[in-house]
Amino acid sequence: MSDTPFWQRKTLDEMTDAEWESLCDGCGQCCLHKLMDEDTDEIYFTNVACRQLNIKTCQCRHYERRFEFEPDCIKLTRENLPDFEWLPMTCAYRLLAEGKPLPTWHPLLTGSKAAMHGERISVRHIAVKESEVRDWQDHILNKPSWAE
């Protein structure tokens, strides 16, 4: 068996489902609601978290059954990855698709999510509960640094 990590020796298409899932750093950025301008198709990021997101841990409360609770939840696959142009520049799926390395704080490299939270990559420092928001437009973020 090779000492080279799977993400360095396999393409995204060659990865097992477990390997694919492990690429997610758990930052929660996918779980923040986005608004799209109907005229321009421009996407606006908000700090409004999906009802299923545990903001403290940045984990879905019902990940395996998330579509039962949130039918519009994102399902990122090998096939639809190109459709998600808004994925943050820090996203492992995006980085590997672009032939770039994982960031040094990535949980696959560090063994925990502490470095990711420490770098403020996760949304736990900006997210607000959907149930506490009246007007999502009041929660539009300037383009977040992780989206650039």
From Swiss-Prot:
Q: Which domain of life is it from?
A: Bacteria
Query: Which residue ranges does UniProt annotate as crossing the membrane?
Result: none
Q: Which Pfam families match?
A: CxxCxxCC (PF03692)
User: What family does the Swiss-Prot or TrEMBL record give for this protein?
Assistant: Belongs to the UPF0260 family.
The name this protein goes by in its record: UPF0260 protein YcgN
